[in-house]
């Protein structure tokens, strides 16, 4: 993510995820603008934020263990997370 040696992710799963106490599903955040990416604005953050213009790739979803998360940059509004999760579901064939 820019000059940093980490990539931010947005958690898109909830407590119904198997082993939710150990891991969750995350969508990748990037500084690369793409037509299908979800732009994050200051209004999308409930707290915190990112230092550069950022976009979520809802087609790049990975399972990450909580122990592997270094720190939180902020938290997104529920409506923003729901929008990202809904778009991610579309890439999985859920309509």
PLM ranges: what are they?
Residues 1-95:
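Conserved functional hotspots at enzyme active or ligand-binding sites that engage polyanionic ligands
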């Amino acid at each position: 993510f820019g000059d940093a040696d980490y990539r931010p992710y947005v958690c898109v799963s909830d407590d119904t995820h198997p082993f939710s106490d150990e891991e969750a599903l995350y969508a990748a955040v990037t500084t690369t603008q793409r037509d299908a990416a979800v732009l994050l604005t200051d209004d999308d953050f409930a707290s915190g934020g990112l230092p550069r213009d950022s976009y979520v790739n809802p087609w790049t979803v990975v399972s990450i263990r909580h122990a592997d998360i270094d720190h939180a940059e902020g938290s997104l509004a529920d409506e923003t997370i729901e929008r990202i999760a809904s778009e991610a579901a579309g890439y999985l064939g859920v309509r």
